Amino acid sequence: MTAPTAIRRLNAADPDFAHHLDHLLSWESVSDDSVNQRVLDIIKAVRERGDAALVEFTQKFDGLEVASMADLILPRERLELALTRITVAQREALEKAAARVRSYHEKQKQDSWSYTEADGTVLGQKVTPLDRAGLYVPGGKASYPSSVLMNAIPAKVAGVTEVVMVVPTPRGEVNELVLAAACIAGVDRVFTIGGAQAVAALAYGTESVPQVDKVVGPGNIYVATAKRHVFGQVGIDMIAGPSEILVVCDGQTDPDWIAMDLFSQAEHDEDAQAILVSPDAEFLDKVAASIDKLLPTMDRATIIETSINGRGALIHVRDMAQAIEVANRIAPEHLELSVADPQAWLPQIRHAGAIFMGRHTSEALGDYCAGPNHVLPTSGTARFSSPLGVYDFQKRSSIIFCSEAGASELGKTASILARGESLSAHARSAEYRIKDDVKGN
C-alpha cells in the first residue's frame, strides 16, 4: 500500500500563518556561478565566431555530427512534412487550438490613435509591430507544441514580419508535433540549435541566424541565464519560475477533480507548486484522500509526489473572503475559482496570471485550447506582470505635431520650465518658435 502524501496543512487562523505562507512561497532559481560563467563564455564565442561557434556547440551539447550551419536549418517544406507525419486527430487538435488562440489574441490588437487640439496641434500614439521575434522551444521528446502556438501566434497577430524559431534536436530527436505546430502558427524560419548559444545567436545574429528584436519562450537554467544577459540588447518576455496553481474552492466540487487539477501543475517538475484554499476543513480532508487515491495511477507519480510534498499545501481559511485575501497575497500563475458564483468574487481578485472561473473550467483547458495565453507570470510577479500577448510584440511611439500657434503657446511654458532647470538651449529652442507678437521677454 502506498504511503499517504505528506502535503503540508496550514490554517490561516494560526498566529504564525503569514510566516509559514512566506516559507511555502519562497523559491529562488538556482544561482550557480559556474553556469553564469559558462553562459558568458558561450555568448562571447557566438558573438565572435558566429555560425562556427553554433556548429561547435551543437556537436558538443546535442551529440550531433554537423558539417556546417546548413545542417541546422529546417526549410518550410520540412514543417509542412511534419503535418503529414502526425495523426489526423493531432492535426485537427492543433488547428482548433490555433484558431482559438488566434481569435482571442486578435481582440488584443492595439491601433494607433490621435486627437487634434483647438489650435491645430495633433497628439497621438503610433503602434508598430516588432520587425523580428525569436522563439525558443525546448527540444527533444519533452518539448511542448502548445508553447509554439502560444508564443508564435500573438507575434503574427501583432504583425511581426518574421518569427524565427530555435529548437534543439538532441541526438537527432525531432518532435514532429512541434514542427507541425510551427507550420500552423506561421513560423517563418527554424534553426535546430538550442541552449545559451541559440539565445545568443538570436540576440546578436550570425552569418545565418538573423538578429531579432525580442526573445520569448521557456528553457532550462542555461537558457534563462542567457536571456538575462542579452536583455537590453534585445527584449525578453520573462524569466519564468516553476509552474503554479492555486485553487480556491467552497467545498462543493468533486474532490477528485480538485486533486487532478493540483496534479496538472505538479506533474511539470519537482519545483512546481499546487495549493488548495478552502473554508471547508472536511473538504480539505477529502481532497487529501483523493490525492492519495489517484497518485498511484499517474504516469508522473514520482514528480507529482515530490512537488506536492515539497511545495504543495492545503490551506484552511475562515471564509471565502479570507480565501480571496490569501489568493491575492500569493498572486498565482493560475487561479481556479471553483465556487458556485465565481463572477461574484472576480472583482476582488487583484493578482493572478489567469483566472479560471467555475467548477467546470480546469486549468488544463487554458494550457492548450481555451484561447488566452498560457505564458503567465510566476513567483508572485502577477502583482506587476501580465500574460504574454499581442502587446508584447508591438511598441508605441508618441506623435507630436505642433501648429504655428500651438508651438508658440507651448513654447512659453517650455521656456519657463527649461530655464528653471538651467537648460538654456532647451529654452531657446522653444523660444525661437514663439511668435514675435507675443515674445517680449
Swiss-Prot record:
**EC number(s) on file:** 1.1.1.23
Which positions does UniProt annotate for NAD(+) binding?
A: Y136, Q197, N220
Catalytic activity entry: L-histidinol + 2 NAD(+) + H2O = L-histidine + 2 NADH + 3 H(+)
PANTHER family, per the entry: HISTIDINE BIOSYNTHESIS TRIFUNCTIONAL PROTEIN, HISTIDINOL DEHYDROGENASE HDH
Query: What is the enzyme's main class?
Result: oxidoreductase
Molecular function GO terms recorded: histidinol dehydrogenase activity; NAD binding; zinc ion binding
Family of the protein in this entry: Belongs to the histidinol dehydrogenase family.
Q: Which GO terms describe its cellular component?
A: cytosol
Q: In which pathway does it act?
A: Amino-acid biosynthesis; L-histidine biosynthesis; L-histidine from 5-phospho-alpha-D-ribose 1-diphosphate: step 9/9
Protein's UniProt name: Histidinol dehydrogenase
Active site positions: E333 (proton acceptor), H334 (proton acceptor)
Under Gene3D superfamilies, the record lists:
1.20.5.1300, Nitrogenase molybdenum iron protein domain
Question: Which residues bind Zn(2+) per the record?
Answer: Q265, H268, D367, H426
UniProt KW keywords: Amino-acid biosynthesis, Histidine biosynthesis, Metal-binding, NAD, Oxidoreductase, Zinc
Cofactor binding remark: Binds 1 zinc ion per subunit.
UniProt record, GO biological process: L-histidine biosynthetic process
